[in-house]
Swiss-Prot record:
Signal peptide limits: 1-26
UniProt-annotated binding residues for Ca(2+): D236, D260, D264
Family: Belongs to the polysaccharide lyase 1 family.
Keyword Glycoprotein: yes
Keyword vocabulary terms for this entry: Calcium, Glycoprotein, Lyase, Metal-binding, Signal
Disulfide bonds: none
The reaction(s) this protein catalyses: Eliminative cleavage of (1->4)-alpha-D-galacturonan to give oligosaccharides with 4-deoxy-alpha-D-galact-4-enuronosyl groups at their non-reducing ends
Organism of derivation: Arabidopsis thaliana
Protein name: Putative pectate lyase 14
Cofactor(s), by name: Ca(2+)
UniProt-listed Enzyme Commission number(s): 4.2.2.2
Length: 438
C-alpha cells in the first residue's frame, strides 16, 4: 500500500511538471517578440491601400485597459501617501519623476510610455552616448561627440548631453532607428536652423528638448545612417517631421515658432504618442496625415495626451486626415481659428480635455471640418466625452455615437477634465537637476 501511494505521488508530480512545461513552452512560442529589426527600411511602399499597418495597434481596447490600470495604480499610491510630494496622477510622470536617482536610471523612462506609441523603446537596449559638442559643420561626415554623429549610428543609443547647449543644425537631423534623445538634467535647445526628421525608421523617443525657430533647409547632401547619405531637397522647416515611421514617442518637449509645423506625422506613420509637450507661438501646430488622397494614412493611430496648447497658437491642435486619433486630457488655453480640425473622414475621440475659447465670438468652435459639406462630414465619427468647455467653447460632434466606432481611436482611460490643470502642470521640457526629484 505504501509503495502504491508513493508511485501515485510521483506520477502526479510528473504530470503536473509536464503540464507546466508544456504551458511555458506554449507561452514562449505564442508571445510576440518585444523588439523588431532595426533595419532602416520603409514599410509604406509595400502596403496596398486598406491593408492594416503591421505597427498599427490591433487591439486598442487592451491598451486602454492596461493604461487604465496604470492610472488607477498611480491614484491608489497617491491615496496611500506614496510619493505624495511629487505625484500628480499623470501616469507617465508618476512612473519616473518621483525617483531622486532618475539620472542613474534614465532608461526606465522607456517603460513609462502610454497610448498608441507605448511600445517605443528608443535606445533602451543600447549604450549611452554623451553629446559633448554642439556644433554641426558637416552633415555628411559629422564629428564624433555631436548630436548628428549620435543619431545616425546603426546601433541602439540612449543619447544624453554633457552640459547646457544650443544646437543650430546646418541641415535636417535625420535619425536612425532605436534612438532616444534625452535632454533631462541640462537645458538643450535645437534652434535657429534645421530641426528633426524621423523618416522610414522605428522606435524613437524624443524627450526634454526645446525646439524652436526651425528654418527651411535643403538642396544638400545629408547622412541618414553610418552607410548612407544622399541628396535632400528643401525641407519644410518642421520642428519634428515624422515620415513613414512607427513606434514614436514625443514627450516633455517645448516647441514654438517654426517655419512650417511644430510636429507633422505623414505618409503612413503610426503607433505614435505625443504627450506632455508645451506648444506656443505658432500657426499650424500639429499635422497628422499627408493629403486627402493619400489613403494609406487610414492606418494611422496617434495619441495626444497631457499637452498644453498655449499662447500664440492659431490652429491645428491637431489637424487630422483618414486615421484614428485619441485626444485626451489636454489643456487648450489659446487658439485663434480652431483647435481640432480634419478632413477625409478621420475618427477623432476627444475625452477629458479643457477648452478655453478665445474672446473672438466667431472662433468659439473647437472643431473645423475642412473641404467637406455637412452632408459629407455629418457621417465622420467625431465625439466629445467629458470635455470641459469654457468661455463659450463648443465641440460639434458627428457620426455614430456608439463606443464600438471609436475602438481604434481609444488608447487610454481619460481622467476627469477637472484634473487637467494638474495633469499638464509640468508640460514642456522639464528643469531637472541631478540628485533631486525631477
Amino acid at each position: 500500500m505504501v509503495v502504491a501511494r508513493t508511485l501515485f505521488s510521483i506520477s502526479a508530480t510528473l504530470i503536473i511538471f509536464l503540464a507546466l512545461f508544456l504551458h511555458v513552452n506554449a507561452v514562449q512560442e505564442t508571445r510576440e517578440p518585444k523588439h523588431e529589426s532595426s533595419r532602416n527600411t520603409s514599410t509604406v511602399d509595400n502596403l496596398s491601400d486598406g491593408e492594416w499597418h503591421e505597427h498599427a495597434v490591433k487591439d486598442p481596447e487592451e491598451i486602454a485597459a492596461m493604461v487604465d490600470m496604470s492610472i488607477r495604480n498611480s491614484t491608489y499610491r497617491r491615496k496611500l501617501g506614496f510619493f505624495s510630494s511629487c505625484s500628480t496622477g499623470n501616469p507617465i510622470d508618476d512612473c519616473w519623476r518621483c525617483d531622486k536617482k532618475w539620472h542613474r536610471r534614465r532608461k526606465r523612462l522607456a517603460d513609462c510610455a502610454i497610448g498608441f506609441g507605448r511600445n517605443a523603446v528608443g535606445g533602451r537596449d543600447g549604450r549611452y552616448y554623451i553629446v559633448t559638442d554642439p556644433s554641426d559643420h558637416d552633415p555628411v561626415t559629422p564629428k564624433p561627440g555631436t548630436l548628428r554623429y549620435a543619431v545616425i549610428q546603426d546601433e541602439p543609443l540612449w543619447i544624453v548631453f554633457k552640459r547646457d547647449m544650443v544646437i543650430t543644425l546646418s541641415q535636417e537631423l535625420i535619425m536612425n532607428s532605436f534612438k532616444t534623445i534625452d535632454g533631462r538634467g541640462v537645458n538643450v535647445h535645437i534652434a535657429g536652423g534645421a530641426c528633426l526628421t524621423v523618416q522610414y525608421v522605428t522606435n524613437i523617443i524624443i524627450h526634454g528638448i526645446n525646439i524652436h525657430d526651425c528654418k527651411r533647409t535643403g538642396n544638400a547632401m545629408v547622412r541618414s545612417s553610418e552607410s548612407h547619405y544622399g541628396w535632400r531637397t528643401m525641407a519644410d522647416g518642421d520642428g519634428i517631421s515624422i515620415f513613414g515611421s512607427s513606434h514614436i514617442w514625443i514627450d516633455h518637449n517645448s516647441l514654438s515658432s517654426c517655419a512650417d509645423g511644430l510636429i507633422d506625422a505623414i505618409m503612413g506613420s503610426t503607433a505614435i504618442t505625443i504627450s506632455n509637450n508645451y506648444l506656443t507661438h505658432h500657426n499650424e501646430a500639429i499635422l497628422l496625415g499627408h493629403t486627402d488622397s493619400y489613403t494609406r494614412d487610414k492606418m494611422m493611430q496617434v495619441t495626444i495626451a497631457y499637452n498644453h496648447f498655449g499662447e500664440g497658437l492659431i490652429q491645428r491642435m491637431p489637424r487630422c486626415r483618414h486615421g484614428y486619433f485619441h485626444v485626451v486630457n489636454n489643456d487648450y488655453t489659446h487658439w485663434e481659428m480652431y483647435a481640432i480640425g480634419g478632413s477625409a473622414n478621420p475618427t477623432i475621440n476627444s475625452q477629458g480635455n479643457r477648452f478655453l475659447a478665445p474672446g473672438n465670438r466667431f472662433a468659439k468652435e473647437v472643431t473645423k471640418r475642412v473641404g467637406a459639406g455637412k452632408g459629407e462630414w455629418n457621417n465622420w465619427n467625431w465625439r466629445s466625452q467629458g470635455d470641459l468647455m469654457l468661455n463659450g467653447a463648443y465641440f460639434t460632434s458627428s457620426g455614430a455615437g456608439a463606443s464600438a466606432n471609436y475602438a481604434r481611436a481609444s488608447s487610454l482611460a481619460a481622467k476627469s477634465s477637472s484634473l487637467v490643470g494638474m495633469l499638464t502642470s509640468s508640460s514642456g521640457a522639464l528643469k531637472c537637476r541631478i540628485g533631486t526629484l525631477c
